[in-house]
Amino acid sequence: MSSVEELFEAMHAWPEVEAIALGGSRATGNADEKSDYDVYLYVTAPVPTQRRKKLLSDYCSRMEIDNNFWENEDNCTLNDGTDIDILYRDLDSFMNGVADVVEHFHASNGYTTCLWHNVITSTIVFDRNGRFAAAQRRFSVPFPEPLRRNIIERNTRLLHGNLPSYDAQIRKVAIRGDEVAVNHRVAAFMESYFDVLFALNRLTHPGEKRLEKLASRNCAILPKDFEANLDTLFGTMFTDVDQLSGTLQIIVDNLQRSVDTNL
């Protein structure tokens, strides 16, 4: 039994833990030698931090217990040097949030279906009463067409064609030479761009990493010159205002053609 498996087994004994799931690249088959462990503990009550610290100290060379930057997490490095992130999620409230997307079709500004993707692609390590497996069955459904349309409508409007759209914001800050703001707005542009692209293909959003590679591999519908235009965008975003502006226009035009053809 590996040290990680021993750690998981010890967590089984915590009465608050309803399920343990392994997510991220180690669950989806996209892991490499640098991949960390993304571990999700679905709980019915908070697990005391002192108990968490006591257990993890046997397996980790570095620990940050009870970080709350995004979710409630223990961010650690295992004794073998591999990073491990342990996230604590209230089972009921988390699944209600997934249902809000999958069953009530609520779209966000980018990353709409990431948590849905996380649930249905996670590997179950422990499931005390079968509730996580039941949630996986509940949400393992075809991509709802109302959700698809809501994501595409909301995020294409963020990309272009409206006063607060990202393309116009990027052009304004690029003309000013504000590189920090250019970086910030291009990142937001990409969030909505990939949200549209995955929804258009009826695919759940895989998260923030390897998006260009995953889209190229998994999306049957891709805008014309998908990879080349992204390369040009990132190659000119700080150096050539005119080419940046022109590339943005090409990207939104090509995406809109794909939407118009396939929606």
Task: Name each model feature, range by range.
Residues 11, 56-63, 255:
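Hydrophobic, Leu/Ile/Phe/Ala-enriched alpha-helical segments that form helix-helix packing faces
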Residues 60-174:
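Conserved NTP/Mg2+-binding pocket subregion across the NTase superfamily
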